[in-house]
Amino acid sequence: PIIYKGNLLDDLFNIASVVWLMVALAAILTLTIIYFITLGEMKDAQKLKDNIYISDKVKTPAVYGIIKPKIILPTEYDANKLNFILMHEKAHIKRKDNFIRLLTLIVVCFHWFNPFTWLMLKLLYSDIELACDESVLSKCDEAERKEYAYTLLSTAEKTNLFVASFGGCKIRIRVEKNLYYKKNFHLI
């Protein structure tokens, strides 16, 4: 009689399933730890007004939180750039970008093995920043657009996974889109 080694395929599937689950759980655990560390750092932030806070723990302006989002500014920020920064961060809040970021991070945790998932994450984060830039630019004249581009350049820093940040995305792309921005005209 012929004996098939069908158990080998079952064993490989079981091993792959366990590896997938362990990596997914490790990723979720890592993100949870990062989230609580970030949350702890934000407890020391001082309230300026409404949902705007200042903290020495952040390097660039950012929005923290999903249910009650807070705009966190670094202690050393330029008051001349504050209007642009607040417009940008308020666009993140209005668009619920932190919720979208959280959902995409969860997707990446479960699809960590797929390189297209990582590409999607990178492109989505870039698009989020560009959409907020466009929201700000739609309210600016040409001189203000140049000032906004300068503001982007001066606040460029690495950002946190969980926050929508003014300094996120590739700054060169954002500045170029900023300088060549054309307002959309609607006929209706």
Tell me what each language-model feature is.
Residues 1-188:
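Membrane-embedded and juxtamembrane structural elements of multi-pass membrane proteins
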